[in-house]
Amino acid sequence: MTNWYNVGRLVNTHGVRGEVRVLSNTDFPEERYANGSVLKVAKSPQAEGTLVTVRSHRTHKNFDLLTFEGYNSINEVECFKGSYLYVSEDQLSELDEHEYYYHEIIGCTVVDEEGTKLGKIKDIIETGANDVWVVDRQQRKDLLLPYIEEVVKEVDVENKRIRVHIMEGLDDE
């Protein structure tokens, strides 16, 4: 079974020639939406969906505009509105050291330097300067951890475990 990873949401059509407007959540739009790239359009990663091949890609305002081979009019792509775009696992590129895909981080257990479990990462917020990892602490307020060297000490993706240093002021409870 192939694993599929979300790279964007089809928010609307654009024009009448089969172009779709995509709100991307990938750091690699040029790679993901390159001509000839195969994507899955579906409501969820488990859904069967429709495989499409990218014919063209351009940016417009804060959106990526795509056309797909075989889809030449607004009527043919209207049904994709509200769906998500997914890439298969074999299309993921190798990342540099200390770079991770969101799916590798979300769900990891977070422990402090003494090994005390703090919770699990449930979301990642992009701030511009650095990402912020949201830790679900059950019955407590979420802990927001900036992804910076001074806080994140070790990431073990294979064991889904992250060791952190809680700087003064990070945990108000």
UniProtKB/Swiss-Prot annotation:
Q: Where in the cell is it found?
A: Cytoplasm
Q: Is the Cytoplasm keyword given for this protein?
A: yes
Q: Give the domain of life.
A: Bacteria
Record's keyword terms, sorted? Chaperone, Cytoplasm, Ribosome biogenesis, rRNA processing
Annotated ranges, domain PRC barrel:
97-170
Which Pfam family would be a valid example here?
RimM
Q: List the GO terms this entry assigns under cellular component, sorted alphabetically.
A: cytoplasm; ribosome
Q: Which GO terms describe its molecular function?
A: ribosome binding
Gene Ontology BP terms: ribosomal small subunit biogenesis; rRNA processing
Q: What note about domains is in the entry?
A: The PRC barrel domain binds ribosomal protein uS19.
Tell me its family.
Answer: Belongs to the RimM family.
Role: An accessory protein needed during the final step in the assembly of 30S ribosomal subunit, possibly for assembly of the head region. Essential for efficient processing of 16S rRNA. May be needed both before and after RbfA during the maturation of 16S rRNA. It has affinity for free ribosomal 30S subunits but not for 70S ribosomes.
Q: Which PANTHER family match?
A: RIBOSOME MATURATION FACTOR RIMM
The record's note on quaternary structure and interaction partners says:
Binds ribosomal protein uS19.
Protein name from the UniProt record: Ribosome maturation factor RimM
According to its UniProt entry, this protein's organism is Shouchella clausii (strain KSM-K16)
List the gene name: rimM
